[in-house]
Amino acid sequence: MRRTRFISVCLSFVACVIFLAARAQKDEEIARLEKVMGWKAGQVVADVGAGEGEFGFGAARVVGETGKVYLTELDEKKRKALEDEVKRREAKNKVVNVMVVQAAEKQTNLPDNCCDGIILRRVYHHITAPDEMDASLLRSLKPGGVLAVIEFPPRKGLTESDPVKGVPANRGGHGIPQKILVAELTHAGFAVDQTINDWPDDSYCVVFRKTAP
């Protein structure tokens, strides 16, 4: 009985440590995104493929009531969960400026020229129609707006399909080579603003800018 209880306590402790480490990493990423993207009060920011929305909610705290944040999600269950989370935070007066948008395979479903900044965190390597999506991302940004793409090099042996089903064959595994990411987005009309190769969890971040017409 004591042994079982001891094991249970140990497992709970390990789970707590893992959770806190993951939370600290996300907080670090949010702080770095704020810096490299230049978030300011009153701006409009979108988190495309937002998942649980941590990065979009992080942006919402910075842009404030005079700004706006879009959280887009393709998966219907995740989108509904985001909507529920927004309502929960609104009820506690934690957010007043966040809108959830149903994403699409080939476009952001965001208004044209609406965003000062767009985040794609570990999303780009899932995109099955990069030419169309890249064009949509460009349209969604204001002139001078920034696009921050966080990705990781191709990896073998992940639990998901390897590479992701339906993506271009040049990915080389689950993930995307930085060189290919940059080539595709510059071809779409973006300009590289900066490249950060020491992003947490063996990832990289490339910040692009939509040049003024």
Question: Which positions does each model-derived feature cover?
Answer:
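Conserved alpha-helix/loop element of class I SAM-dependent methyltransferases that forms part
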Residues: Q25-Q43
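A short acidic, Gly/Pro-enriched loop at the edge of an enzyme's catalytic core
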Residues: K40-Q43, T108-I118
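Class I SAM-dependent methyltransferase SAM/SAH-binding core
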Residues: A46-T108
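A short glycine-rich, Lys/Arg-flanked "PGG" loop and its adjoining helix->strand segment in the class I
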Residues: A60, D131-V146
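Conserved class I S-adenosyl-L-methionine
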Residues: R79-E83, V146-P177
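A short SAM/SAH-binding and catalytic strip from SAM-dependent methyltransferases
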Residues: C114-D131
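Short alpha-helix
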Residues: G173-A188, V192-T195
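Core SAM-dependent methyltransferase catalytic element
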Residues: V192-P213
